[in-house]
């Protein structure tokens, strides 16, 4: 998979995860949960990109 495609998919997953956390909190903004979700997704992107670079 191309790096750009992986990043795009990960960003989409990140947004869906943040929206899900928001809805599960009863539509109350809890920046700690949403921020943690976004940081976790971006760390996942970083790991996947590093693994791809090692394989190629």
Swiss-Prot record:
Topology term for the membrane: Multi-pass membrane protein
Organism expressing this protein natively: Bacillus subtilis (strain 168)
Full protein name: Uncharacterized membrane protein YyzG
Cellular component per GO, a single term: plasma membrane
Transmembrane segments: 6-26, 29-49
Sorted UniProt keywords: Cell membrane, Membrane, Transmembrane, Transmembrane helix
Keyword Cell membrane recorded: yes
Top-level division of the source organism's lineage: Bacteria
Location in the cell: Cell membrane
Origin organism lineage: Bacteria, Bacillati, Bacillota, Bacilli, Bacillales
């Amino acid at each position: 998979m191309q790096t750009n495609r992986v990043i795009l998919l990960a960003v989409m997953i990140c947004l869906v995860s943040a929206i899900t956390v928001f809805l599960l909190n009863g539509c109350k903004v809890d920046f700690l949960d949403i921020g943690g979700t976004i940081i976790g997704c971006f760390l996942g992107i970083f790991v996947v990109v590093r693994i791809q670079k090692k394989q190629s």
